């Protein structure tokens, strides 16, 4: 049993996170950086519709980075970032919980 960060996600939060991660994935791919963590996290989020999201430390930091970049883009273009802010704060405030995996 490992300890991972737990976030309760709904459909809108899920779509915002996937959108932000796709942008980071594209940027990393263009720059020739390793994209394994980002790709795995996008696939993990795409498989799950709603509900519980368990994040490792690398996935947590990648999610915060991606949402922050999306927020900066919105602010630069003069758009509101209220929805992104709420998702970002929820992920940043996430707490550790025991995670047993699929084979409970």
Feature locations, PLM:
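Positively charged, low-complexity terminal tracts
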Residues: 1-104
